Amino acid sequence: MTTDTIVAQATAPGRGGVGIIRISGDKATDVAMAVLGHLPKPRYADYCDFKNASGQVIDQGIALYFKGPNSFTGEDVLELQGHGGQIVLDMLIKRVLEVEGIRIAKPGEFSEQAFMNDKLDLTQAEAIADLIDATSEQAAKSALQSLQGEFSKEVHELVDQVTHLRLYVEAAIDFPDEEVDFLSDGKIANALYKIIDKLSVVQASAKQGSIIREGMKVVIAGRPNAGKSSLLNALAGKESAIVTEIAGTTRDVLREHIHLDGMPLHIIDTAGLRDTTDTVEQIGIERAWNEINSADRVLFMVDGTTTDAVDPHDIWPDFINRLPANLGVTVVRNKADLTGENLAMTEEKGYSVYRISAKTGLGVEELKQHLKSLMGYQSNLEGGFIARRRHLEALDIAASHLQLGKEQLEIYLAGELLAEELRMAQLALSEITGRFTSDDLLGKIFSSFCIGK
């Protein structure tokens, strides 16, 4: 790790009441002596002049000194809190850079120092950026939970359990005369099953946390002229899609990004699905299926005037059977203004069914509440933890190795192969918190932070 002392503006660029300059590294004390003329008492606010090399006052404000390792970064840290004019702050940074051995910080470098000095792990460091970027109260609460170590705690528990089981299995291998007894007595299998179950719970929570952070991708799909584009317009609150009585008007994918109580929702309107010889329409239908296969949720749009059925398997079995097995489906019976249906939501064989009129807006608000619920919106509860795509991928990899290990144990009683799968699962989980993480990944993560964090 670099031993450079770094400086950056910690507050947002532009005009403001207060502006903060942060310095971290062993030269922070030199900066204090050069700019303030003295070293402030650690952890005490010191009102003083900020001076240039000639002794002229640049600004007046509060200086805060934190002696390492008792600081956010683990290094010596000096914060200069002055007036928020950008010119004044630029002059102050220029003055700090005149001290030998100081350079401008790279994006996220303060958080990277904290990570390298074991002041926080990788998920906590990422949570800082997520807290800053939060677009809803729920996202902010979840990011704060991660910053306080809730996600890390879950991952560390899994790593410890996997490590303990791996050591137990390797002990069985080291005593070959007793290996079969060790592997077949049920203790290892029971421990493995418990780990798999716990990982499944963490995966579900992480998936929810990822949706809160990144938004949920919802694809509106169905036959031509079912009202898909009208629903897109109703959810977006504007005329995003052309709506006509002509079936097949939408031939390409249309996207809208909206927020429901601050929670991001990515809505995809697709071409009507049907057999066609029209080349352009065929391309649109192929793209529709590509979007469906990568969706978090499908709104199955049904023209209520064409069928009374509510079970999607009765409405269009070929469509339902082609969907990915783990893809959630909400049935939306449209044109309730014409059918006179009761707008109450019902559950039909595990599917939520909503009756709406995309044209008049009837039932659309209830559908929005449903989507908010799917995204984990809770108006009065503490948030869960926040999660990123890389976390989900690492959890999936760990789950895959545990399943392979389960097969090796149940079918072959292969201790060596089980131990190897446990080792791979351990590595995947440890990458989440940064116990075993490549420098390339660290660089990618911290470079996405804002400067000054």
UniProtKB/Swiss-Prot annotation:
Q: Does the keyword Metal-binding apply?
A: yes
State its cofactor: K(+)
PROSITE patterns for the chain: G_TRME
Residues binding K(+): 225, 244, 246, 249
Primary location class:
cytoplasm
Query: Subunit details for this protein?
Result: Homodimer. Heterotetramer of two MnmE and two MnmG subunits.
- Protein's UniProt name: tRNA modification GTPase MnmE
State the species of origin: Shewanella sp. (strain MR-7)
Q: The organism's lineage?
A: Bacteria, Pseudomonadati, Pseudomonadota, Gammaproteobacteria, Alteromonadales
